[in-house]
Amino acid sequence: MPWGAPVAAAGCGLGAVRRRLPVGPVARRRARTAARVAAWSGAGAVAATSLAAAAVSGLAAFFVRQVVRPVHERPDDVRVLAVDLEGAGPDGPVVTVTADAQTRAPGRYVLLLDGGRRAAQVGRVVREERGAVVRELLAPPEGGLAPGSARWSGTVHVGDPTSALGLAHEDVRVATPLGGLPAWFVPAARGRRDVPEGGAGSTGREGGAVWAVLVHGRGATREECLRAVPLLHRLGLPCLVPAYRNDADAPPESAGHYGLGDTEWLDVEAAVLHALDHGAREVVLVGWSMGGAIVLQLATRSWTADRVRAVVLDSPVVDWRDVLEHAARRNRLPWAAGRLGIAMLARPEARALLGVSAPIDVARLDWVVRADELRLPVLLLHAADDDVVPIGPSRRLAAARPDLVVFRDFPGAQHTKEWNTDPERWEREVARFLLEHL
């Protein structure tokens, strides 16, 4: 039966009733009350819908602000439960920490203490017991280690290249329109090139003609890049490790928020120019996480791209839309809030609400779609267990450009922890790739 039929029949019936029954004061009051209730009900429905839309918009804006807002200090996230420095057992000194996904992960890590001022290096998992993980204690911190709170980190090398690695370095400034960006410069090793087993050969580049420019990820610091410096140093590549806008030790841009690579590539371009001005003829770009997104933007948007010889990406953000949708699901945001937040990034009128200086074109940051624009050889290292930047877009990019992209999965590694999980393999893969392309 058509939707209009019952309504019409009811209307006719109501009219017939009105004609038959007298309408007194009580009936009129009841009718007025019913009309008011109906009016308030309709207004309430509209208000509820408006409130729901406002709530979704608010959630979307809050979500995006958390993504673009730099975080320079992170809270402690693990507890040290016990420390055995005597090493009476076969495993030597050990430390017991609360168990979770990160403390169970294989490899080498650090416990950051006192707000990151001290660090204890830990190694393999010795055993797991009720709610706790016992790991090798490779290097206790100065001042000792005792039960208490700490922060778990994959940035094993804490400090600068000299204090953390024993490599001579210079503190330099990279000139940009925003001001000087601090950077570490590590000269190449002189003489014989040492390469990991399985990567025999030489770069054939004497005199530092090829430099490496290393770019850290979102929320990290230049220390994240130090894991790669010893290998690159042995391969004869001078290393330049710059900060970029909105880092704690770098000038902020006007809004003080990340551009997700859409603006930061200009700072890495300035670092490449610094290298070219100081003796480099070509560069290798190495980027972690958002640093990978930054590197990819430079490789296609900068006039210096023709001086880039090769690219190494570790856990890179290949498609920001995929990463943001994944983050929204992890944070249990309504589907509409996540999608709206992504759409808001590109809207000029949402800049003030989101705290960004310019709209961010997420489509321009999708390298699966833009795969045919790549012109440089890429080594792409990623882990299937990465729960921050999913591996899917990296796999799709590698499948789209097998002529340029060499893809290597690191089972069991978490986000940007490929080196931590298997440093020997990481160095072997990077050395083999660079020796082939330099």
Name these PLM-found stretches.
Residues R301-D361:
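Hydrolase active-site cap/lid region
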Residues H257-H278, V284:
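Alpha/beta-hydrolase active-site loop
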